[in-house]
Each structure stands twice: as structure tokens, then as C-alpha cells.
């Protein structure tokens, strides 16, 4: 049999289309002057520096230190909106612009107190000191070689002595060569080769 159509199963008519609405343009952020951007960056860096200095001092209570760390995170975030950063700066530091002006005045006064005076030795030529001249000071490490007692540069050169080849000849032609250590004559012939194996 036939199924009865209920209100639910009846297709709804399509909605009446009126005039086609144009999409509303997204509000573009107002163009910000380059000077204002630079000023904001300076203020932002100053505030981050002040908060970081306070945090690094270690004198803050735990709750205040946590809030300061959160504020630094917001200020250094690249995704946080500009308005949020300004709010955090105002809440954390109060009138930060006035504080910046005071600090700038202090630094300006300090920079005025610095004086540069020319040195009197500026006309004097510089000189180079060789290392060999410094070695005579005695501060450098030296071996314990005997040093000549007299200055050899002031003495006349001594004549070269004639070479006498007979001075190289041993005094006794029949004596065997000996080292400079003593061996008892009775033990010199007591060498035992019993432990040596001379197989070829």
C-alpha cells in the first residue's frame, strides 16, 4: 500500500533568494608609520630588559617571578597582538614611557661627565723593542750554563792555537781501551756464557 507522506518527509522549498550580499571586506589594520613601529620596538625591548633583569635578580617572590616569566613570554611572542603586548607592558611596569625618559636623562648626564683628554706623548714616536734586548732582564727561563765572567766583545780576539795530532794518541800504546768506570781485575775474567744458546 501507499505510504503516507508526513510533514517530515516533504521536501522543504529552497529559501527565497534576495539580493546577493557582497562579502564585507575584512578590516585591514591601519597602516602604521615606520617611526611608530621603531618607537614600539624600542619600548618593547626596554620592557623585556627590565623584566628580565628583575627576574634574574632572584629577589622576586615565587608568584611574582612566575607572572614576570609569563609576561616576558607574551612580550617576546611573535603571535601575540600588539594591543596585548601594550597591556602587558602597562600592567607590569606602569608608566613605562616616563621611566624610559628618566633612565635616558640619567644616561645623558652620565655621558656628559665623561671627558677625553689627549695624551702628551702623542707626538713621541713609538719604538720597537726586540726580544733579544728583553732576554737580559733575567726574567726568562734559562738553563744553568756557565756564563762568561768577562764581556768577550771588548777583548781582542785570541789567536787560534796550532793543532797537535799527537795529543789524540793514547798515552800508552799497549794499554787496552777502557771506559771510565772501574772493574775489579780479578772479576774481569769471570764471565759465564753457560746460559747463552749460540745456535746458528
UniProtKB/Swiss-Prot annotation:
Residues 1-28, 139-174 are annotated as: Disordered. Pfam families: DUF4615 (PF15393). It comes from the Eukaryota. InterPro entries: DUF4615. Belongs to the UPF0488 family. This is UPF0488 protein CG14286. It comes from Drosophila melanogaster (Fruit fly).
Amino acid at each position: 500500500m501507499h505510504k503516507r507522506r508526513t510533514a517530515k518527509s516533504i521536501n522543504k522549498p529552497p529559501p527565497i533568494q534576495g539580493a546577493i550580499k557582497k562579502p564585507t571586506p575584512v578590516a585591514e589594520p591601519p597602516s602604521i608609520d615606520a617611526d611608530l613601529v621603531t618607537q614600539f620596538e624600542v619600548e618593547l625591548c626596554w620592557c623585556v630588559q627590565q623584566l628580565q633583569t628583575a627576574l634574574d635578580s632572584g629577589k622576586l617572590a615565587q608568584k611574582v617571578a612566575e607572572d614576570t616569566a609569563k609576561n616576558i613570554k607574551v612580550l617576546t611572542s611573535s603571535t601575540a597582538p600588539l594591543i596585548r603586548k601594550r597591556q602587558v607592558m602597562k600592567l607590569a611596569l606602569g608608566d613605562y614611557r616616563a621611566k624610559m625618559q628618566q633612565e635616558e636623562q640619567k644616561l645623558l648626564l652620565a655621558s656628559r661627565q665623561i671627558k677625553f683628554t689627549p695624551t702628551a706623548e702623542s707626538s713621541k714616536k713609538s719604538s720597537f723593542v726586540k726580544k733579544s734586548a728583553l732576554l737580559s732582564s733575567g726574567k726568562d727561563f734559562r738553563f744553568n750554563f756557565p756564563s762568561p765572567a768577562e764581556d768577550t766583545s771588548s777583548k781582542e780576539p785570541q789567536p787560534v792555537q796550532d793543532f797537535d795530532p799527537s795529543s789524540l794518541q793514547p798515552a800508552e800504546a799497549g794499554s787496552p781501551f777502557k771506559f771510565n768506570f772501574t772493574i775489579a781485575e780479578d772479576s774481569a775474567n769471570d764471565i759465564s756464557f753457560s746460559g747463552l744458546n749460540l745456535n746458528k
